[in-house]
Amino acid sequence: IILFNSDYNPQNEQEYLDVVRRYRVDGVLAVPIRETSAEWQEYVKKLDVPIVTVTRRAKGLDSVYVDHIQAGSMVASHLLEQGFRRFLFIGKDYDGKYVGFRQMLVQMGYGEQTANLVYQDDVQLKQALELWFRQASERGAVFAGNDIYALRVLDALRKLDVFIPKEVGVIGFDNTSTGRYLNPRLSSVSQPIAQMAQEAVTRLLDRIEHPGQWEVLDYPLSAELVLREST
């Protein structure tokens, strides 16, 4: 087993895929760092080894993943039910989580009250959150693309003396263990990691042991809201 961690760096990801090609491995479990592009999909197909993508869907490749669009929509519905009326997503606008989040809010009439912010550093985040918070009096909510971003949001809001969730709600994604020990404890979205891993490994071994023509596996799983005090 060869394990690579790209550290969310696209260049590292590309280099590690090149290593996979050189070492002629038997199979690959890939966890793409971003939404898979057509170019990425074509490149990994040329590796000429069985490959299963995990956590994100890749067209034309076996994929075991959580439907991020559905998860984002679910988060939006929850925040609306809690009385929030302005919304900020921390992450890229092409992230499936934001796509589903925004689609639901547009459908409910809150498209103009919804925006996204790409994280650069803690100073930029604090300044952007302060500007967003001061712009309007309506109660707002921040949906962070992962729990790490959510922790940074909570820290920035505390430094701005913003009351959570009375003035601003915060929800993350991944449901990491850290969120349970914060004050307030962090609401988040949980992915069925064990099930994803089991299905992906089973599929990869089948591909390795029984090569040939297979129908492409498209295996979406549902995420689950884990609600705590931050929303």
Enumerate the language-model features and the residues they cover.
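Intrinsically disordered, low-complexity polar regions and short flexible loop motifs
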Residues: 28
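Helix-turn-helix/homeodomain-like alpha-helical modules used for DNA recognition
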Residues: 1-15
